[in-house]
């Protein structure tokens, strides 16, 4: 049996295949996922799993160099924004509009759907390198 934190085989596979600057997104349960991206649907019921649980788990497995957030997140969901900043540390944050974020999802290796219902609980993680 796998010993590391991440048990979901589809998510583990995507992360294992990611190279420098590849992107993966985590979204709330309402985020539209484009056909161009692999859908990894973790949503069970409202709120399970949460956006933050999913983000923290992925960060155990994936080195990131940048995150992309919708500009609206800071104003509409300030508590979530502060939690994200706390978890990512000194990682670069790029802000784009929510509409631009939805378009950028087409370039992501996968979009992970959570049970989160907080508005604008969506993020794109850009893979870094461990050296």
Swiss-Prot record:
Its EC number is 5.4.99.62. This is D-ribose pyranase. The active site is at 20 (proton donor). NCBIfam families: PRK11797.1 (NF008761). Homodecamer. It is an enzyme of class 5 (isomerase). Keywords: Carbohydrate metabolism, Cytoplasm, Isomerase. One of its GO terms (biological process) is D-ribose catabolic process. GO terms for cellular component: cytosol. Substrate binds at residues 28, 98, 120-122. Gene3D superfamilies: RbsD-like domain (3.40.1650.10). Pfam families: RbsD_FucU.
